[in-house]
Amino acid sequence: MTAPSVKSALILVDLQNDFLPGGALAVPHGDEVIPLADELQQRFDLVVATKDWHPADHGSFAANHPGKEPGDRIILDGIEQILWPVHCVQNTHGAEFVPSFDTSRIDHVFHKGTERNIDSYSTFFDNAHRRHTGLAHYLKKRGIKEIYLMGLALDYCVKYSALDARHLGLKTYVIVDGCRGIELRPGDIARALEEMKRAGTILLKNSDI
């Protein structure tokens, strides 16, 4: 068993309407993690959450590039970008937390993907590491040395958050049964898990905490 310490934080990644079944960018079985997110919050002294929070003209949206389709790749502001369906547009229903998700214990919500010309999978930085979300400073100010990540999607936002957390020197756990992946390509989830492990992320299940 791994007991969270007072220097641990639970980070709930992108539990938003557009990422659940029926949403604009649905993660298969994403709804299954909501009860666990509610349960786990009771075990931590600090809980933060993130939201994808895009302007309507965001460069990652295929609809903003005539002739392009979701899944196509372009160069956006100097880095490769996968194009996605329009999702999690600021101040829309799709960008809001799932109604069944208990947000009463969340201490702070961090927004990402707010800049038009660059995406932000990680909860810490944009994809080029040019701007930060404020999460790293928030954790440091509160003496947080380790984090537990869960949410959507495992092979994108959870993975890149874990990699950045390790780069920042945080002891990083990913609660695997609290995540679901998109798996655009077969094997993406397995590759994401392996990449996180190689970076020093500790993979565990809810029952291990």
Task: Walk through the language-model features, giving the residues of each.
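Active-site alpha/beta core segments
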Residues: 38-146
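Structural recognition of alpha->loop->beta junctions
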Residues: 82-85, 99-104, 186-209
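Short, glycine/acidic-enriched loop or turn micro-motifs at the edges of active sites
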Residues: 17, 55, 115, 154, ...
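A short alpha/beta connector and helix-capping loop motif
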Residues: 6, 22-52
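Histidine-anchored nucleotide/phosphate-binding helix
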Residues: 37-40, 158-169
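Short internal beta-strands
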Residues: 48-51, 173-178
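Extreme N-terminal starter segment of soluble prokaryotic enzymes
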Residues: 4-10
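Glycine-rich anion-binding loop/nest that anchors nucleotide
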Residues: 144-160, 174-176
